[in-house]
Each structure stands twice: as C-alpha cells, then as structure tokens.
C-alpha cells in the first residue's frame, strides 16, 4: 500500500456517504435465513445476495482511504477509523458490517499524523521467516490480529509473501524470504493466526511485485512454468495453509497487463486453478479501469482517492447497466466479499468499535519470543558469544543502541507504545519517519553485565569509537540499514560509513561482535576481522531485551537465514537494479530470465559461493543428524532421520531436507523439500519424519496444468544449510503426475 503523503492529486468526499437506515438489532436479524450459522458460507452468501439492491452490491466493491488528505479535497468517511488504511461500507439493514482495514504484517499500523495508534510490533516478516517455525508465525499473527480487533478493525492488510528475487528491494523486510515452501508456510501460518480472531487477513502483493523501483510502471516478463514453481508457488502454499479471506493484487504489470486487471493472474490461476473463493482487492492506486478490471477478476477497488478515477461505484453500475460487465459478474464480486465475511465470522462475531483493552505486557512477550527465535548467529569465533562473566569493560557502539531498535518503514509502520525512542528522524514524507522502538539494547546489556562498566558511544566518530574499543574487554557494534516501502536500497553496503566504523573498531579490538539491524542481506567487508556477527533484523517492540538475552546466552540463537547473503552484487541475476529511481514514471521491463532459480537455486546453478548461504545459522550448542531414510509409497515421499543435541546446552535445531532430481531435470540442482524445527536438551535425541510435497519433486507443465515427477533416482539430503549437507540417500521415484494443486 502507498501512504497519504505520496499522493499527487484528487477527489472529494466518498460516494454512498448518505445516512444509512438504522441498523436492525441482532435479535431482529436472527430469524433471517442468511443468519443461520448451520448453513455454509456459500449458502448464506446466495441468500443475502437475493435481498440486496444494486446500490448495496456496488457499496461492497468500493473502498476508501481511512485518512484525511489535507489539500487534496478528500475527507475520510466519517464511519472510518482515523488515520487508518481503508474503509468499505457494509449493508447494515441486512446485518453486513462495514470493513475497517488496517495495515499490515507486523502489527496495527497508523498513517502518519498527530494521533497515531501506539501498538505492539512483531519483528520484521524476514525475522519471523528466519525462525523456520510456523508455530511462531501463528502466535504472532494471533497477537496482532487480537490488537486489530481490539482497535476496531476487522481486516488486516497482512500476509506479504513476495519472494526475495531482488535483495535490494525496500520491502523485503515485510516478506518471508526466497524459498516458496518456507515463505508460503510461515506466511500462511501467520494469516491463520490473524484470522483466528474472526477478522480477515489479506495475502499480498499478488504477484511478482519484487522491487519498489518503478513498481507502478514496470512490466515483469516470466514464463508460466517458472512463475508457478517460484513466486506463484509461494502464494499457492500460503493460500492453502492460511485460507485468507482476501488477496491484494499488486501495482506492476505482468506480461504487459496490470496485475489488478490481469485475467491470467486473477481468473485463471487464483480463482480458477487454485479455487480461491474470497475477494481480490486492489492495492491503493493499482486500479486502472472499470470494465477490464471487473471482467478480468478484480472484486474491490481499494483506497479511493489513490486511483486516477473511481472506476467502480457509479462507473461500474453504468457498465453493468450497459451490459459491458455482466450482472452475474457484479453478483460474483459482491458475493466474494460476502463469502469472506461469512467464512471468517465478521458477520456472526462483529467488531464493536475500538475497545483499547490490549494487554501490552503479554503481547510484548509474544513479539520478544519471535525476535529471539529469528535472530541468526552468523559468526562466533572462539565462542566470543555468549558474553562471559568477569568482564570489566564493555563498549556498546552505534545505531542508537542506548535507546532503542530500528524498524522498517512505509505503510506497515507500527508506532511504538510509549512513543518513538529517537525523535526527528526523516524522511519528512512517506515512507518516513524512521522509527526506533524504545527497547534499549544498552539497558538490557547493563542489566546482565554484573560489575562490568558498560559504556555507550554513538559511533559518529570512528576514531573516538576505536579509542573506546581499545580500552574495553569486549566491544559490541550495532549496525543498521533502514529499508522501506517505495524505494530500493542503491546497494547492499551498510549506509552512513558504518563499514569504516566497524573496521576501525575491530582493528582496535579483535574481541568485537557486530549486531546487525537490517531489512535483509548486507555486505560485510570487515567480516574476517570481527569475532562474532548476530543478525537481529528489525526485532520489534521487545527487540532490545531479546538482543540482550541472546547475547548473554539466556536464549540460544536458533534462527536460520531465509535468504542468501551474496558476497557481492555481481553475483545477482541482475547486478544493476532495473529502472531509474530518479525517473519514477519510466516504463520498463524486468525480465526474470533466471526463471524459477531464485536465491540459493541461482547460486547453486551458477556455482557461486555466497557470503552466507540460505538456511545458515549457528548455535551455542551442536547437533547431529543420523539414520537418514527416504521412502516412496502411495504417491508420497517420506523422509526420516534422528536429530541429537551433542552439545552442553539446550537449543533448537532446524533440520532442512533438500531434494535433487536426476541431473538436469529441474531449474537448479536442488530444492528445499521439507524442514522441521525441534527443541532438544543436551544429549537428547528425537526421530523426525517429514513429507515432501509432490510439487517440490516435479516440473510444472503449462500445457495440461499438471506437475510431473520424472522417473529416476533422486537424492535426499538432510542439511544444516543449503551448503552444509549432513547425510544423503537416494530413492527411486516412479513417473507420477499430480494436478495443478499437487493432488
């Protein structure tokens, strides 16, 4: 979504804003046939549709921005919630509530302004993906969904599952990484958690919206099979596991057609092949037509006044009256909105306005657990971490670590309970401001450091920081990379001369640990000179406490990378980012010539050695994987093995199962086929059994819309990362065909 500050134009007060008739009470509605909870959502939808007027149907497919736009001649609907993302009128006489929409994937966001909501923020989506734990995804989703409901919202624009094809993408921090199985599983679990609160979650940004530069104008070129085995597979898995009520189509074009009027994406794949029964909503400003958009699968225009025109509403009514859009299609559009509302109990268990009864202390523990489980220990020479007792002087340097932790920017921005830790940071317009959550790593470290003197230096003067480092027993440098919606980073280097700062500090004291607060991968020219590196991502509301607990060993790090960290930008499929950020209206093509070879698959295919591979993550303990076996029966590959904690402390292991086809059959040498995360005490062992989705063993066949597994010997490997195999076996698979959904 795009925020108010980025708008250039438009629009007066909303249509359909006349006073509605007084809503009947729930008791008065109880006898209506569509209120019978024993009927299916589909049956109830058809019953209530028959009672609706044409205008009421048109109401359901037109959404408005929930924030006033000063100087733009737009006032939000009075029924909307202030500084919110969106609002859709319901049909109160029939018991159909309004839709109150809030961004986004890490919590209840607010549009920038004087009266922001202060809410709990999860860590970044990238952090949650790095947990490799769907239970963590579900718990976080359930928590932010509860806050949304308590804040008066019944729809969250959460569920970003765009694959990380482009490491410089400013929104990567919102997403679930580069692998379709991992991303789809984690995001699907989060959607399920959100919707457990009887609200709708939104799978987005559909599809192939993998960079911010030129996002409104670029055209993605990729063939059907490649998309089905990569980006679309991530959406397919998230849809299957999360069952979202809505899907948000994206800004970009795909094969020359805008995503929000693209019949291939919306009608053929999403609604046809996958059987999606909910509704498709546009991103804010992503609708471009009336007839084409409606007929090609868009069900709801969102975010008036961001589009150039009100394409739905009166214009859609005229198109139906003239036969340009069939009446049956309008009924389908409104029916899909109603279906989602019935299916996810927005009608049976309606929100009743903001309650502000949030248990922030309890929710802080949920987000803290997510942060702790997603942090990735990338280097730990000579067991520099966890921090040992008996140190006399500890230096903490950089990135406002004295007061808080960084978050990602844009429409997903959650404003912290207690206010921003650092005031006055830009940008002054969208996607700003830069927000630090008031959870101080320095205070968390001081609380655990015993009699050690803990000194903070802001890092603005590398020479002064180096002098402090030289006089300290241990140095912890906090480094940051702010990323946000609406722009991509120019390169993967840390900004603000931080590489020079880290190099100077490490030269002064080799007992230096670096804590990274980044949206994704960064380069590390100083890596060989530091003792330890902890990737903390954007760690959310309780991030400072979580960092302190991991640094001191109260929590054993168990995160594993959901993306590849390249050694240089020259290793990427596109070393230079397509498009020109200085010419945002330039139309251009982005050719995904790598096809389905995204992330680690590209590195495997080209024989490239990354800085850190996909799936990588160290621990304060050690694990072994033994007894690997693979068995094919009844069209299903099952893999089993035993994990043992061979170290001295408790920890969690992420066992990764990779599968490799007979040579040359796939887009890359191997694919992630399954994964399992387990907590084990020292000396404890446990047998694990996982199943590999048949689609991950197959090639997609566009001609007949099937997945075909070729007969032959397949290699099955249990590994600690994409480049760290522990054991391998071969298994003979027969030629097998499954349908478009892997059945």
Label each region the model flagged.
Residues 1-16:
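Gram-negative bacterial Sec-dependent N-terminal signal peptides
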Residues 18-699, 706-723, 742:
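Glycoside hydrolase catalytic-domain context in secreted enzymes
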Residues 725-740:
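Short beta-strand elements
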